[in-house]
């Protein structure tokens, strides 16, 4: 196996401390990350930097590497290498030396299986109005960069322009193939999963594909009937209130709910009778006339009965 100049790869000196090397690694990992860099050899450079960091970040491996690098031009290097404790290693042991330094990379690099990258999940808030049709959305997330030990070394910001399809529901998962972390040894990238979160609406409650809205009406509107303006997700409509309507009564408006691939839900207007403020003398007299005219009516007649 070729002994690479890891210091040159990292752009540092053999005398530099770990902090300096770590700073260089983070800068180069960000520069050559395959999902960020536009350079044609970015993936190869990224892996090379990661390999160098794996060795130089470990004090023991770095010391052994430095000793091997010092003797790289020695004619005896290919036949015999002297470890720090004076022990001699023959050519057949050379592979083992590399393995001890590089954590089996030297011996098994070509035998390691392709590993798929990690998936990433992010929550995407969506307003009810946005679910009615397909819309574009710019999303930003952090792409973790893993070191050779499987630990997150840093995070690289990434931005994508995506399409959110019509009819998405709360908790729905949308897969963006290959937008997760890069694979290893030729393995495929992980995926990015968008988790849809329907934001609460100040007027509408969601019940499956249907919507509910509380519609305040005056007592005389409930008694006499009439038309009131009611908002929907698209526009306002005139809702007919039947005469004799009761508080809590649900009036169905067909096709004004949420859309989906299978069908469109309905809107249900739930009537709420709202009393006017404290009445004046004239209003009180009218209420008294109504009470006298309906003296036989007992609203609690069936109260408590099954």
Curated annotation (Swiss-Prot):
GO terms for molecular function: bent DNA binding; unfolded protein binding. Coiled coil: none annotated. GO terms for biological process: chaperone cofactor-dependent protein refolding; protein refolding. It holds the Pfam family DnaJ. The keyword Chaperone applies. Keywords: Chaperone, Cytoplasm, DNA-binding. Its main location: cytoplasm. It is found in: Cytoplasm, Nucleoid. GO terms for cellular component: cytoplasm; nucleoid. PROSITE patterns: DNAJ_1 (PS00636), DNAJ_2 (PS50076). It comes from the Bacteria. Residues 5-69 form the J domain. DNA-binding protein that preferentially recognizes a curved DNA sequence. It is probably a functional analog of DnaJ; displays overlapping activities with DnaJ, but functions under different conditions, probably acting as a molecular chaperone in an adaptive response to environmental stresses other than heat shock. Lacks autonomous chaperone activity; binds native substrates and targets them for recognition by DnaK. Its activity is inhibited by the binding of CbpM. This is Curved DNA-binding protein. It comes from Escherichia fergusonii (strain ATCC 35469 / DSM 13698 / CCUG 18766 / IAM 14443 / JCM 21226 / LMG 7866 / NBRC 102419 / NCTC 12128 / CDC 0568-73).
């Amino acid at each position: 196996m070729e002994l690479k100049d890891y210091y040159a790869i990292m752009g540092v000196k053999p005398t530099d401390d770990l902090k300096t090397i770590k700073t260089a690694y983070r800068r180069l990992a960000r520069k050559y990350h395959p999902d960020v860099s536009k350079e044609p050899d970015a993936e190869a450079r990224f892996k090379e930097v990661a390999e160098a960091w794996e060795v130089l970040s470990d004090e023991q491996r770095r010391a052994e590497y430095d000793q091997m690098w010092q003797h790289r031009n020695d004619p005896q290097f290919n036949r015999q290498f002297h470890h720090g404790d004076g022990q001699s290693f023959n050519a057949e042991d050379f592979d083992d030396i590399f393995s001890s330094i590089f954590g089996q990379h030297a011996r098994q690099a070509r035998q390691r299986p392709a590993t798929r990258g990690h998936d990433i999940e992010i929550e995407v808030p969506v307003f009810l109005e946005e679910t009615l049709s397909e819309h574009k959305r710019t999303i930003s997330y952090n792409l973790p960069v893993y070191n050779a030990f499987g630990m997150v070394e840093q995070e690289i910001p990434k931005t994508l322009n995506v399409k959110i399809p019509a009819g998405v529901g709360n908790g729905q998962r949308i897969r963006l193939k290959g937008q997760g972390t890069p694979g290893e040894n030729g393995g495929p990238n992980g995926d990015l999963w968008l988790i849809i979160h329907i934001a609460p609406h100040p007027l509408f409650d969601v019940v499956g594909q249907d919507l509910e809205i509380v519609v305040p009406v005056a007592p005389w509107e409930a008694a006499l009937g009439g038309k009131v303006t009611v908002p929907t997700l698209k526009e306002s409509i005139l809702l007919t209130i039947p005469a004799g309507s009761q508080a809590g009564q649900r009036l169905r408006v067909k096709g004004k709910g949420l859309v989906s691939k299978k069908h469109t839900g309905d809107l249900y207007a739930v009537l709420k009778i709202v009393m006017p403020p404290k009445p004046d003398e004239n209003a009180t007299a009218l209420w008294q006339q109504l009470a006298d005219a309906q003296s036989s009516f007992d609203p609690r007649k069936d109260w408590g009965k099954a």
